[in-house]
Amino acid sequence: MTRGKFFIFLIFSLALLLTGFALLYRYTQTHEVIAFWGPEGSQSISSPDHLELWQLVPWTDQSADLPQGSTIPIQDRQYIATKKKDVTKAPGFINASGALILNRNYNWSPRAEESDCTPAWTHALLYRRGAHTTVVAISLNCGWVYSRKANRVAGINKSVTEGLARLFQEQLGS
C-alpha cells in the first residue's frame, strides 16, 4: 500500500471511529429524556416552531365547564392558564430548552429523595412543532417537571430550576 492510500485509509478509519463515538455520546446524553418526553416531544423541545409560557392555577370551579384551549391535566387534576405569553424569541428560552433535553439535568426518581415535597404546578411551557404539542409542566417549589406522555414526574437540578424561575419572573412577573 502506498503512503497516500495509507493516509486516506487512516483518515476514513478515524472518521468512522469518531462518528461511532459521537452517536454513543449523544445516546448517553439523551436516551432517558427521549423515554420521558417521547421522540416527538423531545424533538419539539429541542427545536420548537412556537413556544408559550403559561402561568397555572388549579381548576376548582367544578360547576362550570372547563374553558377550551386554556387547561392542562397534570396528575389527574385540571389546571387553568391565568396568563399566557409567546416566548418563542424571548432571551434565555433556547438555553432552557436545551437544558430540558439532557439526561444530566434530571433526577429520574425525585419522589424517593423528596417525598415530603408537595408540588405546586404553577407554570407550563408548551412546545409546538408542526401539529405536535409537548407540555412541560413545572413545579418550581419541588424542582420537578411532569410529562403527560410518561405520566410521571422527574426532578430537574437546582441550577435549571433557578434559571427557569428567573425566566418566568422576567416574562410574567410571577
Residues of each region from the PLM?
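Function-determining sites in protein domains
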Residues: 3-13, 19-174
